[in-house]
Amino acid sequence: MNDARSDLITLVLSIFAVLIFASLVGYVLHRRLSPDGSNSAVENLNARIKAWWIMVIFIGVAFLAGRAGVIILFAFCSFAALREFITLTNTKRADHWALASAFFVVLPIQYYLLWAEEYGIYSIFVPVYAFLLMPIISVLRGDTERFLIRIAEVQWALMICVFCASHVPALLTLNIPGYEDRNVLLIAFLVIVVQLSDVLQYVWGKLFGRTKIAPKLSPSKTVEGFAGGVASATLIGASLWWITPFTPLQAGMLSLVITLMGFFGGLVMSAIKRDRGVKDWGNLIEGHGGLIDRLDSVVFSAPIFFHLVRYWWSLT
């Protein structure tokens, strides 16, 4: 346990060092290239750095607090993300009981089952039980106008914001031989690799981006940015093998999988935003829009990462 805490502290301090360096670079760029705030690229970069400071502090404190801190943090994230998602849906008064059940019954039960390490139930609770419960509650109100669209939106919200997101702290429940009491480092690995991929795709795209991947969905995403960001994040993931139960090659392969899932997850969530006619999911995090804007890549990659690790490395 002491080794795990020591590795975690080393990792957190390293991230703080990187953020300090990034903040200094951002300050210099602001003074030289955007003293009046007119350079959108520089201002966007500094907004991202400020948001990263806030997120890293919260995540770092949760990690150091242990299992309870991590589960509470992601339960809060699920609640906030679910609120953002539901705000953009077509729900009506007839759906209020279903929504109340989603927030105050389904979400708490999912995280309680995770806390109790009941994999057999929490792995199917939302996609089976909650999936069937939501339309039952709504149909009892008797309003059938746009019923399929309304209930599908609620089901999608639960799948993304609760089910997928809960697979991040679910990594704490895995029983990996020789890796006891170190599972929090798996979460650190997942979040760092996926989030760095997002940042590096942005940087590579700004420096070398020419060919847009999906102009209507996300104009800032380019082939060059995608390739450079994914490749860089994969190499960084391989270099972080020492905090995982993986070999460098395995860490690199898993990093490639989760960065690809994160990228496509971002595209899917961008498509939903465009369908709703909005630029961001919310304004909770300055410089990053809503919580979903920041975590979309993580929640898409988390279930894949969890099940790959559980199948190949875990005893349970």
What kind of region is each of these model predictions?
Residues 175, 308-316:
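Juxtamembrane boundary at the C-terminal end of a transmembrane helix
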Residues 294-311:
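Final/C-terminal transmembrane alpha-helix of multipass membrane proteins
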Residues 276-297:
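Interfacial loop-to-transmembrane junctions
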Residues 250, 295, 314-315:
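Short, conserved aromatic-histidine micro-motifs
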Residues 205-209, 273-276, 299, 303-304:
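Re-entrant/interfacial helical elements at transmembrane boundaries that shape
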Residues 2-260:
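Membrane-embedded alpha-helical bundles of polytopic integral membrane proteins
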